């Protein structure tokens, strides 16, 4: 099994890809993980690698700092690759952007803290799920780690919301006719007290 982990940070600034890679290695012994930067990604590359799954990491900078040209390849992969794809935090937002849906600052300010002139949802908070897809065999309310101040403002066409809370209406989404999933939270940052994120990742790897 080859996991293609797309690093959405600029110049490696950001912990998301490293944390995802470390957790994947712990969860599945012998798992092969290839990490490449977002600007090197193309549909041709994916067809050549033939990974079993694709994961989109969080990003390190505001989306305004990413040029359309640098994102063109990964956007095409998101729209066309047949493999199961999971977007985490910024990767979730990246899925929305690739289909033309808006991403912006959260309007609801609780719970959160001041962050660069906005409010940031940071810490372990509950979300309500529909218990389908990557939330299969999980309770209808799970507790997962959040660290964001942007959110997907509207669902892309052909998607449905699969998780929400009072702070963020689209905590997770899935494309109706493909195994394409986005989660605004960080399932990889689970611990013994908050194990739900682990099951989310395991469910994805079983697809």
PLM feature segments, named:
Residues 12, 61-63, 92, 152-153, ...:
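Glycine-rich nucleotide phosphate-binding loop and flanking beta-alpha elements
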Residues 3-28:
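Short, charged N-terminal beta->alpha structural module
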Residues 20-23, 70-75, 103-105, 162-163, ...:
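Glycine-rich, phosphate-binding/catalytic loops in enzymes
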Residues 12, 185-207:
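Acyltransferase
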Residues 86, 97-195:
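Pocket-forming structural segment of enzyme catalytic cores
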Residues 8-11, 59, 178, 188:
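Flexible loop residues that form catalytic
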Residues 21-87, 99:
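Flexible gly/pro-rich beta->alpha loop and the following alpha-helix that scaffold active-site loops
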Residues 6-8, 38, 90:
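Cofactor-binding loop segments of dinucleotide-utilizing enzymes, especially the Rossmann-like FAD-
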